[in-house]
Amino acid sequence: MKRFIAVLVTVFTCLLGANNAFAADDSNALQQIKESGTLRVGLSTFVPWAMRDKQGDLIGFEVDVAKRLAADAGLKVEFVPTAWDGIIPALLAGKFDVIIGGLTITPERNMSVLFTHPYSYSAVQMVASKKLASKMTTIADYNKRSVTIAVRSGAYPVQTARKLFPKAKLRQFDDETQAFQEVLNGNAQAALASTPTPEQMVIKNPESLFMPFKKPLTRYATGFAIRQGDFNLLNFLNNWIQVRTEDGWLNNRYQYWFKTTDWQNLVNENN
């Protein structure tokens, strides 16, 4: 009996130590950020979430969000531009503290990272070639082996394409500009992207492009992403999102970047 009790005490002590270790790790990220005085933000450039202006500085919805978040916390902000298909691995490797980059909340991604509550919502739309697809107006028209659809690698529209157009050939690119160029060059019938980019591309190229569907193909929520276990940081970020949602600031920035074109003359044409 004494031996059994001794074993139980040992097990309990180990579990208590493990819990204390987890608790220490839990507060580690937020404490480290406070001590460093800088919030490191991972993002990938794509219009109008994040892009370069004519002076080479980052601007966009996510840039505004990250700057306001850091300012409210009394921190400096450091942006870490990262290729989209490698942004989650970079977060897990400690290259930055948080992803603020229009990252769609999905169960698959949630297996690797912690997501905050949504801070914005978006949708996926299709842009098609007038030359190659003028008579294609249904999902079935694009769900054929003879159809090529261009998308940005690692982005949520990839999932939409695979779900709705499993028979089509999917061609993936490092950025959306290349995907749309593939359609303009006549190498793909269509491209998928998050709004408002498809609408803007049609406005810029009315003679070449059109939108075959009036309603979005899918809708989705976006959240900040942090490393698993950083629950104190998660609590802070969720509370910040709630405060800036309730006071209307997030909606104000969303309306400016997604519902107007007032900012377009600021943008570097190479974005």
Q: Residue spans of the language-model regions?
A:
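Ligand-binding clefts/hinges and TM-proximal coupling segments of bilobed small-molecule sensing domains
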Residues: A23-D25, Y156-F173, P212, Q242-N271
